[in-house]
From Swiss-Prot:
HAMAP family assigned: Ribosomal_uL6_B (MF_01365_B)
Gene Ontology molecular function terms on file: rRNA binding; structural constituent of ribosome
Function: This protein binds to the 23S rRNA, and is important in its secondary structure. It is located near the subunit interface in the base of the L7/L12 stalk, and near the tRNA binding site of the peptidyltransferase center.
Alphabetic keyword roster: Ribonucleoprotein, Ribosomal protein, RNA-binding, rRNA-binding
A Gene Ontology BP annotation from the UniProt entry: cytoplasmic translation
Organism of this sequence: Bartonella quintana (strain Toulouse) (Rochalimaea quintana)
Keyword match Acyltransferase: no
KW tRNA processing (keyword) present: no
InterPro entries registered for this protein in UniProt: Ribosomal_uL6-like, Ribosomal_uL6-like_a/b-dom_sf, Ribosomal_uL6_a/b-dom, Ribosomal_uL6_bac-type, Ribosomal_uL6_CS
Protein name per Swiss-Prot or TrEMBL: Large ribosomal subunit protein uL6
GO cellular component term, pick one: cytosolic large ribosomal subunit
Family recorded in the similarity comment: Belongs to the universal ribosomal protein uL6 family.
Length: 177
């Protein structure tokens, strides 16, 4: 039995939710999101509480039960508060700057990397070595952060590269003479 899936989801204040078959819609102060729940999972909306349960006891239905509950909770949290990821840039001459809506990254290549920000995502650069990505869709915010990090992953010897603010880089010692 899923420990996450069996918890009911209460709709936060300021958010309106509708359930139409397998489609869950949420509208809040930050915007509107929807999620199509897998056919293996049942969604019930009673009062101000949404409960999720598997249609049958098959392994496939039970494996998607907890994930469906988490996804529904994430859309409620996203339309109410939004999500944010911070990236840090370490390295001599490594920096970021906004160029219109796009992000210009100087990461030691012979050319600057221009990252086109998808719609629904806001990117700010408070310092040249810090990038803040925010939006209402948790998956999309994480995807943008991962794509920017992928241009120059942190290396283990000097720690140069783009890393998440809360990420700890395992450092290695150089060759001994």
């Amino acid at each position: 039995m899923s420990r996450i899936g069996k918890k009911p989801i209460s709709v936060p204040s300021g958010v309106t939710a509708t359930v139409e078959g397998q489609l869950v819609k949420a509208k809040g102060p930050k915007g509107e999101l929807s999620y199509i729940v897998n056919d293996e999972v049942l969604v019930k909306f009673e009062g101000n509480v949404i409960s999720v349960s598997p249609r049958d006891q098959s392994k496939d239905a039970r494996s998607k039960w907890g994930m469906s509950r988490s996804m529904i909770e994430n859309i409620f949290c996203g339309v109410k508060n939004g999500f944010e990821k911070k990236l840090e840039i370490n390295g001599v001459g490594y920096r970021a700057a906004l160029q219109g809506k796009d992000v210009q990254l100087s990461l030691g290549f012979s050319h600057d990397v221009i990252y086109k920000v998808p719609p629904g995502i806001t990117v700010t650069v408070p310092k040249p070595t810090e990038i803040v990505i925010s939006g209402i869709d948790k998956q999309q915010v994480g995807q943008v952060a991962a794509e920017i990090r992928e241009y120059r992953r942190p290396e283990p010897y000097k720690g140069k590269g783009v890393k998440h603010a809360d990420e700890c880089i395992f450092r290695k010692e150089g060759k001994k003479k």
